[in-house]
Amino acid sequence: MAKPSTLDGYRDECTLDCERVLVTLLRGLGPWKDSVYLVGGLTPRYLVPARPPVVPAHAGTLDVDIVIDLQILADTEAYHTLEENLKRMGFERAENEQGVQLSWRWQTRTEHGALMVLELLADAPQIAGGRVQPLPTEGTISALNIPHSSIVFDLYQVAEIRAELLGGNGVATERVKHADIVSFTCLKAFAFDQRFERKDAHDLVYCIEHAPEGLDTVVAAFARALAGKHAAVVREALDILRRRFADEEATEAYRKDGPVAVAKFELGEGDDAGQREARVLRQRQASDLIDRLLSGIG
């Protein structure tokens, strides 16, 4: 499913609907909700709680990405609970471009016709190695293997989210485990490196740039993570940030594909002089931010 390549392709209403999808899903999962972790484009809403005009608007999202513990797929009761909950919410399996039904991507439409997409992700190196690919299943539900996504099981925060349940079933509040600034930045760095989607660059820069307590707290969080069990994964992600966003002898940082992706996503691709100048300024801001992050981490 192709995503918009610029910020103006996203709408606040879709983000709010995605929040409803998440809360509705968790409301019906019972004890298994503790094995579900939010990643992806809805996460910045909780990492950066400030809203315009205090901070610039984040793009939002068109889908809900959750990492699930493999135990949910392995445990018969948990599997059927998830399956029944998806069907009760009106979800059905999405199709790829060839018309083949996917076991890890599900979709439904809200009351006003907006298409909502839920993607189930997991980290199963013993099954799929380091490849991004669907995990095998004998049923209708599986997950897409996303290498390193299990770091969110340790590097997460909790937010209380209130939303109107799908189907007109009232307002509910759920505690949502979501990626913290370190795991979110790492997973977005891996995603940008692999698929080169502009929004991944926007997401990671936005959350670092507008971290509630400033860049120093982000640096401190990375320092703690580098002293923990996921140090190797974090270092790999930082190497990607260095390669995609930071200065080196051969190329000025602002000209690299990371800052350019941020600027084109946020400001569009217009070719008049004013827009080109605005993009270059934004590129410099993005590259400077990542340079300061990397310098602070050391």
Feature roles, as predicted:
Residues 1-298:
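Compositionally biased terminal segments of proteins
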